[in-house]
């Protein structure tokens, strides 16, 4: 039996989950699990009755989709894309997004024809009931344009405001990180676990920056939080995108990540990765995090309370 944190609309709850195996077809370690999760070895994106697919089946095909989209974006990567106006920037961003979305949307829609589709990856807040695909076809898109390596393709299936599966693909390294509710988080076959660091003063922490159109109060809050962490943590990293920071928290490479406001596509993939890797999620004041929260904190259990204390000053 494994106790897992599951994200609900208004709070987190702890649920005992049994799973017998999750196929190595999409890179998950299976020997740690006992129970009922299985995946058809013959499932293909076409020819599968979506109503019969398990969440493990869906994750396997979601991985296939994000890898295909990532390959298309990798072919567009290399030279710095120059732009002289905001309009030129937006066109360049849209070209990348449309390229990946043209691959992702039909594939994911075939998997769950009745699932909703979040049209704007920058939207935040709670979703209506039911299933929704929350996708960022080029997370870290500006980095891609500047020939920087920190970008990814993400797809998350949300059910009644709980992320149930996510796939994050890093096209430049070929790595794929996955999480399935109750079955852990994995990076290319290796099960992930957050760090065991117990001293914020020895911790590497990270945050993202405010969006260009963000409210001034949020911008000031971001600045104040960075100042506070510079005093208390060992190293403070500030860059985008959020999901890559959260992947690093899940992998134990860094110890905490926080953000103010934030879009669903920024936070939901990483929230599932971190919770399935044994991390703690809350807002920056230590209250249960929900998509309605105005702040977000993901941390290793040993430094979570210290991070809350620092960010609450």
Mark where each language-model region is.
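Structured N-terminal alpha/beta-domain signature
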Residues: 97-102, 116-119, 136-151, 171, ...
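Short linear segments in intrinsically disordered or otherwise low-structure-confidence regions
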Residues: 9-11, 19
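Residue-level signal for inorganic ion chemistry
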Residues: 73, 108, 141, 170, ...
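N-terminal subdomain of lithium-sensitive/metallo-dependent phosphomonoesterases centered on the IMPase/IPPase/PAP
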Residues: 4-7, 26, 30-138
């Amino acid at each position: 039996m494994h106790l897992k944190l599951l994200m609900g609309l208004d709070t987190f709850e702890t649920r005992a989950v049994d799973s017998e195996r999750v196929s190595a077809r999409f890179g998950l370690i299976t020997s740690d699990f006992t129970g009922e999760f299985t995946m058809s070895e013959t499932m293909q994106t076409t020819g599968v009755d979506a109503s019969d697919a398990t969440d493990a089946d869906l994750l396997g095909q979601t991985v296939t989709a994000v890898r295909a989209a990532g390959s298309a974006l990798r072919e567009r990567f290399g030279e710095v894309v120059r732009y002289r106006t905001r309009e030129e920037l937006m066109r360049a961003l849209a070209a990348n997004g449309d390229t990946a979305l043209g691959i992702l949307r039909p594939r994911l829609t075939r998997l769950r024809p009745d699932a909703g589709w979040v049209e704007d990856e920058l939207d935040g807040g709670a979703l209506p009931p039911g299933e929704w695909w929350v996708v960022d076809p080029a997370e870290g898109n500006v980095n891609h344009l500047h020939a920087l390596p920190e970008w990814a393709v993400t797809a998350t299936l949300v059910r009644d405001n709980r992320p149930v599966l996510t796939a994050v693909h890093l096209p430049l390294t070929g790595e794929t990180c996955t999480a399935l509710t109750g079955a852990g988080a994995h990076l290319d076959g290796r099960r992930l676990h957050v760090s065991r660091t117990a001293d914020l003063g020895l911790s590497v922490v990270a945050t993202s920056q405010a969006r260009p159109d963000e409210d001034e109060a949020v911008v000031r809050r971001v600045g104040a939080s960075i100042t506070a962490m510079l005093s208390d943590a060992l190293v403070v990293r500030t860059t985008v995108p959020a999901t890559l920071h959260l992947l690093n928290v899940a992998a134990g490479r860094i110890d905490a990540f926080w953000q103010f406001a934030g879009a669903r596509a920024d936070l939901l993939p990483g929230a599932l990765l971190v919770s399935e890797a044994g991390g703690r999620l809350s807002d920056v004041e230590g209250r249960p995090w929900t998509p309605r929260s105005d702040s977000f904190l993901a941390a290793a259990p040993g430094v979570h309370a210290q991070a809350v204390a620092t960010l609450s000053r």
